Regions:
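OB-fold and OB-like single-stranded nucleic-acid-recognition modules
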Residues: 20-127
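Bacterial N-terminal signal peptides
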Residues: 6-16
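N-terminal secretory signal peptides that target proteins for export/translocation
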Residues: 1-2
């Protein structure tokens, strides 16, 4: 009886720990530059940052050595930045190198979100 109960509890805990796959759209941006896109209040008072800053981010900047090294993520349309896992950053780098797009780096990402990181299952540019 105890063994069955333990097995059921373990199975339930395993299922509860698995997060459902999420699909997110936004702008591909490196982690180093993502802080520029974060919305913040400046003197005036006025807001700076946000999607307009993320959309202005260029492929050229994202491929600079320091930006490459920092890794990549997606700046979402609700003004949040989700870091890619290491494999996702490698996928993003390969896409950026192969792309002719200079800006407007809109992407669709699917994967498992864990805190502020997304474990990338698929990544593609969208129009």
């Amino acid at each position: 009886m105890f063994a069955r109960l333990s097995l059921c509890a373990a199975l339930f805990a395993g299922f509860a720990a698995v997060a459902p796959a999420a699909q997110v759209q936004g702008i591909l941006i490196d982690q180093m530059c993502s802080s520029k896109a974060e919305v913040h209040i400046v003197a005036g008072p006025r807001l700076e940052g946000g999607m307009i800053v993320a959309e202005a981010h260029t492929r050229q900047c994202a491929l600079m050595p320091a930006c490459e090294k920092s890794g990549y993520g997606v700046f979402t349309y609700d003004n949040k930045f989700l870091k890619f896992d290491e494999a996702g950053s490698r996928k993003a780098l390969a896409m950026l190198r192969a792309s002719k797009k200079e800006d407007d780096l809109k992407v669709e990402v699917s994967g498992e979100i864990q805190g502020d990181t997304i474990k990338v299952a698929s990544l593609k540019f969208v129009e």
